[in-house]
Amino acid sequence: QSGRRQRQMCIRDRSHSGDINRTIMEQLLMVDALKRASAKRITAVLPFYPYSRQDKKALPREPISARLISDMYVAAGVDRMVSIDLHTQQIQGFVDQPFDHLTAMPLFVDYFKEKVDGPISIISPDAGGVKRATIFAKHLEAYVGFVHKKRDPKVHNEVKSFTVIGEVEDRHAILLDDIICLLYTSPSPRDVSR
C-alpha cells in the first residue's frame, strides 16, 4: 500500500542486531520514507529507548544523547513516540509531540505473585531505582532495599564494592533493574545475599 494520508506506525525491534546505531538509522530512514509518501501521522515505537542513560551531563562537555535521539526522530517527521519502561521520566519532556510511556510492570507483578511463595524483598541495584522498586514492592506487598555502589568516577562501568541496604535475609530477593547491558555494575546474587 502507498501509506498516503494514512496513520503509520514505525516499530523498531533491536533483537536482530547488536548495533544500536544501525537500528536507529534504519528506523529514521523508514520514518523519512513514510513522511515522503504523505503519511498522515507517524508514530515511532521504540520498545527500548536508545541512549536513555545519557539523559543529562555527568561530566563537562558530554552530550545529552537521549535528547539528541528525540531531536533526530522529530526532524525525520515523527508525530508521536511510544516507549516502554524509560530509564527516566524526563525523556518524555525532550519532545513537544505526544510521548506514550508504557510499562511492563503488571506482567512481572502477575508472574511473581504466581511463582513466588513467601516473603519478598525488591532490591534496586542503585539508589536511582528505589522509586521504581517501591512501586513494584507495593504491588507485591514486599520489602524494599537497594544496593549502594562505590565507584571510581574515572573508570566507566566499573563498581569497586556493593553494600545492600534493606532486609533480604530469609526472603526471596528480586533484583529489579531497568537496563542491564553488560552486568558490570549489577551485583551478583551472592553480593545481594550477604
What role is predicted for each listed range?
Residues 15-24, 177-182:
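Short, glycine-rich nucleotide/cofactor-binding loops
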Residues 65-75, 102-120:
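Hydrophobic alpha-helical segments within soluble ligand-binding/sensing domains
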